[in-house]
Amino acid sequence: MSVDAPPDTPLLWVLRDSLGLTGTKFGCGVGQCGACTVHLDGVATRACTTPLSATTGRRITTIEGLSAEGAHVVQRAWVAEDVPQCGYCQAGQIMSAAALLARTPSPTDEQIDSAMRGNLCRCGTYQRIRAAIHRAAATRTETR
């Protein structure tokens, strides 16, 4: 897929404005809050600071494409643990959590905290976020 945009355009704006993928949110614009997290080749990446030119030939996954089979295991765990409040940070949090579980199937609390450190939640649901990640990890282990 290609879009007509300058190479220095942040990926976030291409996703939202050119492709209509509005699940990825704008939070701070400087890569500090995590609301714009997407996956580039499976790695959690801040779309607001990633120029379009850095995505050439790479696989981009947004919250809309996280699972081809309905809700992703992390999304189901999010609901089960009642994580969302306002929901604004949710897509970025889920994308970071999914990337963590892809590389660390059974993370410790410390690994979760480290991976999620760059994702801010104004509602302060950090304990539920951690619980949801543990639930998703356990669910993934049970279904293997």
Model-derived segments and spans:
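Signature of N-terminal electron-transfer/Fe-S-associated modules in redox systems
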Residues: 1-144
